[in-house]
């Protein structure tokens, strides 16, 4: 299946599985999606993820994280830069999500990273999405 915006598709799959309280969600893999999954893991939004070889690009299997009473670790996901309207931010205008409680995932010349790391590295880039 061909998808126009693979990152929006990934975020939608995670959002839907999260709202339905599923434990795992499978997403078609790509380098960028693997980098986003790694950031979600490092920031504590997911339990873990694994790459499953299917003979093509592979599949990312994400294990979602919930609290003791099934409270969601991910409250919201929002795609910012879209194929029809790219959104870029310089190093001095990187967004803060919910006053620092959430993260912005930025695609920079030094790779995909959070807004906090991009500020520390002193780089700007394309604002892919917000997670809170």
Curated annotation (Swiss-Prot):
Keywords: Ribonucleoprotein, Ribosomal protein, RNA-binding, rRNA-binding. SUPFAM superfamilies: Ribosomal protein S8 (SSF56047). Disulfide bonds: none annotated. Part of the 30S ribosomal subunit. Contacts proteins S5 and S12. GO terms for biological process: translation. GO terms for cellular component: ribonucleoprotein complex; ribosome. Belongs to the universal ribosomal protein uS8 family. PANTHER family: 40S RIBOSOMAL PROTEIN S15A. GO terms for molecular function: rRNA binding; structural constituent of ribosome. It comes from the Bacteria. Gene3D superfamilies: 3.30.1370.30, 3.30.1490.10. One of the primary rRNA binding proteins, it binds directly to 16S rRNA central domain where it helps coordinate assembly of the platform of the 30S subunit. This is Small ribosomal subunit protein uS8.
